[in-house]
């Protein structure tokens, strides 16, 4: 009888320990989720910045990667990617390098078409159109004979100019993940077509689907802050073997001597 009581007591203590441990883990996970959201909120607070020249007076996170006296360079990038059953994958977008030292901005409007040959091999063709920015206006630096294309470039707006995440904390049922080995982190939300940012994208792009997108915020590097890592956002409307429709955007603050587009990992779905 005494042995039975001791056994029951031990079992109760084990169950209680497991319960307390689980609560502790849940609290730790919630704390990490909160840290990830706060990290994303820092960059999302830049949206919207209607006048791109305001970035000349904005300073981002600085670390030992910056040389003394370097004011840094902002890299902003937006592009739309569309592939349907009846068309090849095509991306159209722009990247700008906003140098705070020289207060000058240059970049490229890039059109990429990806085709597949009869053997199933993919081939990409990039066409770049160099641009500069003056008085918040995008100006091609080389003649463009195609009037429609020239107007598309001159009228181009980056997502950071019109996107708005003031309601980001109201987004429900987010899927937050963290990989300490990389380190990398992300937050995914299912949006509705009534979402402000979704409406803005549909207003500016001919998006050939009525499906509401998922918003993916992703980053890598130290959660406490780093100029080496990157943060990107993606609105994915459709993603399967035959069709891909998504929009990507990023705003990064980097040392001025390190403005290579590829080296900064702007997106794993980059040009």
Curated annotation (Swiss-Prot):
The keyword Signal applies. It is a lipid-anchor. PROSITE patterns: PROKAR_LIPOPROTEIN (PS51257). A lipid is attached at residue 23 (S-diacylglycerol cysteine). InterPro entries: Csa, Csa_sf. Residues 1-22 form the signal peptide. A lipid is attached at residue 23 (N-palmitoyl cysteine). One of its GO terms (cellular component) is plasma membrane. Its main location: membrane. Keywords: Cell membrane, Lipoprotein, Membrane, Palmitate, Signal. It is found in: Cell membrane. Belongs to the staphylococcal tandem lipoprotein family. This is Uncharacterized lipoprotein SAS2373. The lineage of its organism: Bacteria, Bacillati, Bacillota, Bacilli, Bacillales.
């Amino acid at each position: 009888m005494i042995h039975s009581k001791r056994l029951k007591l031990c079992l109760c203590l084990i169950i209680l320990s497991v319960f307390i441990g689980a609560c502790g883990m849940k609290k730790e996970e919630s704390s990490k989720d909160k840290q990830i959201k706060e990290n994303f909120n820092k960059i999302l607070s830049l949206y919207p910045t209607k006048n791109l020249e305001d970035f000349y007076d904005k300073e981002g996170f600085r670390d030992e990667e910056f040389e003394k006296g370097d004011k840094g360079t902002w890299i902003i990038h937006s592009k739309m990617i569309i592939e349907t059953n009846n068309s090849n994958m095509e991306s159209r977008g722009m990247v700008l390098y906003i140098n705070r030292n020289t207060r000058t901005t240059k970049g490229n409007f890039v059109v990429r078409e990806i085709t597949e040959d009869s053997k199933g091999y993919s081939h990409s063709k990039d066409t770049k159109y160099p641009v500069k920015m003056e008085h918040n206006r995008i100006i091609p630096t080389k003649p463009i004979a195609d009037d429609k294309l020239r107007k598309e470039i001159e009228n181009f707006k980056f997502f950071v100019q019109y996107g708005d995440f003031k309601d980001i904390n109201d987004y429900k049922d987010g899927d937050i993940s963290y990989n300490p080995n990389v380190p990398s982190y992300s937050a995914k939300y299912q949006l509705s077509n009534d979402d402000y940012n979704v409406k803005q994208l549909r207003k500016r792009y001919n998006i050939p689907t009525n499906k509401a997108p998922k918003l993916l915020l992703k980053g890598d590097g130290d959660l406490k802050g780093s100029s080496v890592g990157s943060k990107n956002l993606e609105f994915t409307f459709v993603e399967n073997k035959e069709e891909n429709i998504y929009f990507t955007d990023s705003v990064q603050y980097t040392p001025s001597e390190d403005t290579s587009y590829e080296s900064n990992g702007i997106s794993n779905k980059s040009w």
